[in-house]
Regions:
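Short glycine/proline-enriched loop/turn "hinge" motifs that connect secondary-structure elements
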Residues: 52-56, 154-156, 225
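Bacterial N-terminal signal peptides that target proteins for export
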Residues: 1-8
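Pan-zinc metallopeptidase signature
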Residues: 261-263
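Active-site-proximal segment of zinc-dependent metalloprotease catalytic domains
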Residues: 126-205
Length: 263
C-alpha cells in the first residue's frame, strides 16, 4: 500500500508538469512490475503440445531451484538436456540455477511444494520462451516408506512444475554400489518430464493403450497415468542396477499427476 501511494503521488506530480510524459511513464511502470503467470499455473499435461513442438515456443528456460547442499549432478543435467533436445526438438535450452535455503520440513505435502514454488520461482513464460521450474528438495514426500520399498523420487503437479526429492534420490543411490546419484537423478528427471509431455494419457493421446491401473480411494481400478510395459520409462516402478539394485515403487500416481492448477 505504501508503494502504491508513492507511485500515485509521483503520477500526480508528473501530470502537473507534463500530461503526455505522465501517461507514458505510468505504462512503463506497470509493464515492468506485472508478470503474467497464468500460462504456468495450468494442469499437468496442458503444455504438452507447446513442449513437444516449436509452433508457439522455440526455447526452454529451466529453473533448477535447489536447497543448499542438494544441487543435482552435472552429469545428470547434461543427460537430461540431451534427452529434452531429442524429444522436444528445441535446440535452445537454458538452465538457470537458484540456490535456496531449506524449508526445514521433515516431509513435504503437495500443497507445501506448491507454496514453495510460489515463494521461490523466478522464471515464467515470455514471448517464445517456455519456462519450467524444477525444485530439488532436502525433504522426502509425505507418506514415504523406505523400509517398505515405497517412496516418491519425483512428482509433477502443474503444467511446468516438478519436484525431485533429492534427499530420497541420494538415499536410494547409497543402497547399492551398482547405481549412483547421476543414474537415479537422470531417470527420475526423464520420467517426470514425460508427464509434462502428457504421458501417460495426461494430454497426449495414446497411440496404443498401455496405461497401467491402480486402486483409487474407493478401491476401484483406474488408470494411473503410468505405463504397463516392461522396460518403459513411464512405469510407476523404476528398477535401478539390475538384480543387485534396489527396486522402489513410485508413489507419484494420479493424485500428483492431477496436481493443482492455482496458488
Amino acid at each position: 500500500m505504501t508503494k502504491y501511494k508513492g507511485l500515485l503521488l509521483l503520477g500526480i506530480l508528473l501530470f502537473t508538469f507534463s500530461c503526455s510524459k505522465s501517461s507514458s511513464d505510468s505504462e512503463d511502470v506497470n509493464a515492468t512490475t506485472q508478470v503474467d503467470k497464468s500460462g504456468n499455473l495450468l494442469a499437468t499435461g496442458d503444455s504438452a503440445f507447446d513442449i513437444l513442438s516449436n509452433d508457439n515456443f522455440d526455447k526452454l528456460l529451466i529453473e533448477i531451484a535447489y536447497v543448499s547442499g542438494f544441487r543435482p549432478t552435472e552429469s545428470a543435467m547434461t543427460q537430461f538436456t540431451d534427452y529434452l533436445k531429442q524429444h522436444t526438438f528445441k535446440e535452445d535450452i537454458e538452465l538457470v540455477y537458484n540456490e535456496l535455503s531449506s524449508p526445514s520440513e521433515d516431509e513435504l505435502t503437495l500443497q507445501e511444494i506448491a507454496d514453495l514454488e510460489t515463494s521461490n520461482r523466478t522464471v515464467f513464460n515470455t514471448g517464445s520462451t517456455l519456462a519450467i521450474y524444477i525444485y530439488f528438495a532436502d525433504a522426502p514426500a509425505e507418506g514415504d516408506d523406505l523400509d517398505g520399498g515405497l517412496v516418491t523420487l519425483g512428482s509433477v503437479y502443474r503444467n511446468t512444475s516438478m519436484i525431485i526429492h533429492e534427499v530420497t534420490v541420494r538415499e536410494l543411490a547409497s543402497l547399492s554400489a551398482s547405481i549412483n546419484e547421476s543414474d537415479v537423478e537422470t531417470t527420475t528427471l526423464n520420467h517426470e518430464f514425460g508427464h509434462l509431455f502428457g504421458l501417460v494419457d495426461l494430454g497426449t493421446e495414446m497411440v496404443n493403450d498401455h496405461q497401467s491401473q491402480s486402486e483409487n480411494e474407493d478401491g476401484q481400478l483406474v488408470g494411473d497415468n503410468h505405463c504397463n510395459q516392461e522396460g518403459c520409462l513411464m512405469r510407476a516402478e523404476l528398477q535401478f542396477g539390475g538384480s543387485s539394485g534396489k527396486s522402489l515403487s513410485s508413489n507419484a500416481l494420479a493424485k500428483y499427476e492431477a496436481g493443482i492448477t492455482s496458488g
